[in-house]
Amino acid sequence: MKVAIIGATGYGGIELIRLLEQHPYFSIASLHSFSQVGECITNVYPHFQNVLVHTLQEIDAEEIVKEAEIVFLATPAGVSAELTPKLLAVGLKVIDLSGDFRMKDPFIYEQWYKRAAAKEEILSKAVYGLSEWKRSEVQNANLIANPGCFATAALLATLPLVRSGIIEEDSIIIDAKSGVSGAGKTPTTMTHFPELYDNLRIYKVNEHQHVPEIEQMLAEWNRETKPITFSTHLIPISRGIMVTLYAKVKREMEIEQLQKLYEETYEQSPFIRIRLQGEFPSPKEVRGSNYCDMGIAYDERTGRVTVVSVIDNMMKGAAGQAIQNANIIAGLEETTGLQHMPLYL
């Protein structure tokens, strides 16, 4: 199956290229850019030399559909909302890595993203592509809203507790830390090497745009869920996310019950790895892979459960999950082309 990538020169775009070039079923028909049309991708990123030869093309839905069936949008918020109606109109399936189609309520999108929302008729067609929890909807979708990186790690950790109803609905606290690639390709003072090296920074306190998508998804599984407390930090690594979830249980529990809950929830999910009791993962152990690793603890003194969830923000948090969703759409095993061992060193 032929695919196209729009926004091919951003970090999400080049990760898609890396994965799709090694995929046994998908092949890249075309790469598209806004600012570097006519350039060969190897001139922009020399590490692709002798691997692929593609000239970056203009974005024309009528031309793209002549060769491709699926389009990946690795574009900033606001851009996808403008492009997607044209792509859907010519019969392309769209997997969008931006936040433009994650929120069902346009008012909430505008409140958190500070920009105009996509048209409601397009929003209504979008499926939130958290693969492990939305497989059946993804399978028949024409438009996938690929989840945010923080949201992916947070939801995979939180949903088993929320669905089971065993935690106090107003007790969810999520502390999240990300490598610098999560901030995107455009440099800022905050991501400048001297500012972040040997340092860490909290940012978007109570304002991060992944909050509403987390709350929206939690509410799908438990309408009693209340607003969450969510904080995000930049740490001096290139890629990787660690989320630490805290929540208070409604009644006394045994750690074995919680361990069993997670193991049974994800027993049919090949990319979710639950650590043995008392063991906890680190981002290095999933780097370069599509895995989400989790460890669970329970504090009898406080009645709180702690879940540690780690992913590679460029893989399970972006391009990897996008291809996982494409696999589901194409009727393939969802692991196809994604069975990379983590790059520990």
UniProtKB/Swiss-Prot annotation:
GO biological process, one term: L-arginine biosynthetic process
Database matches in Gene3D superfamilies: Dihydrodipicolinate Reductase, domain 2, NAD(P)-binding Rossmann-like Domain
Keyword vocabulary terms for this entry: Amino-acid biosynthesis, Arginine biosynthesis, Cytoplasm, NADP, Oxidoreductase
Pathway where this protein functions: Amino-acid biosynthesis; L-arginine biosynthesis; N(2)-acetyl-L-ornithine from L-glutamate: step 3/4
One GO MF term attached to the UniProt entry: N-acetyl-gamma-glutamyl-phosphate reductase activity
SUPFAM superfamilies with a match to the protein in the record: Glyceraldehyde-3-phosphate dehydrogenase-like, C-terminal domain (SSF55347), NAD(P)-binding Rossmann-fold domains (SSF51735)
Superkingdom of origin organism: Bacteria
Annotated Pfam families: Semialdhyde_dh (PF01118), Semialdhyde_dhC_1 (PF22698)
Reactions catalysed, as given in the entry: N-acetyl-L-glutamate 5-semialdehyde + phosphate + NADP(+) = N-acetyl-L-glutamyl 5-phosphate + NADPH + H(+)
Catalytic site positions: 149
EC number per UniProt: 1.2.1.38
Compartmental location: Cytoplasm
InterPro entries reported for this sequence: AGPR_type-1, NAD(P)-bd_dom_sf, NAGSA_dehydrogenase, Semialdehyde_DH_NAD-bd
Functional summary from the UniProt entry: Catalyzes the NADPH-dependent reduction of N-acetyl-5-glutamyl phosphate to yield N-acetyl-L-glutamate 5-semialdehyde.
PANTHER family according to UniProt: N-ACETYL-GAMMA-GLUTAMYL-PHOSPHATE REDUCTASE, CHLOROPLASTIC-RELATED (PTHR32338:SF10), N-ACETYL-GAMMA-GLUTAMYL-PHOSPHATE REDUCTASE, CHLOROPLASTIC-RELATED-RELATED (PTHR32338)
Family: Belongs to the NAGSA dehydrogenase family. Type 1 subfamily.
Name of the featured protein: N-acetyl-gamma-glutamyl-phosphate reductase
Organism, as annotated: Bacillus cereus (strain AH187)
